[in-house]
Amino acid sequence: MVVIKNIRRIDHKVAADCYIEGKETEHFYLEIDVLTMEIVTNTLGEMNAYVFHAMQKLKALVLTGNKLPATAMSMWC
């Protein structure tokens, strides 16, 4: 699970600080372009399951059109 904190909208981008559950020292910053839905910044450097699920959750939050929450969680089975 990825804990997504400090979700914020910056112009046409959405950004968040992401923490890997159980590994709180491992975190990454993710920034997604809302128009193209592509990753602009990923401080983890690589695309893996954590980044993918955080990206999917951020996209889903943006597409709902509601106000962005401050915190969210991305879970998978």
Predicted regions mapped to residue ranges:
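N-terminal start-of-chain detector that recognizes signal peptides
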Residues: 1-5, 44-47
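N-terminal acidic leader/helix
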Residues: 2-35
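Acidic, low-complexity intrinsically disordered segments
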Residues: 25-77
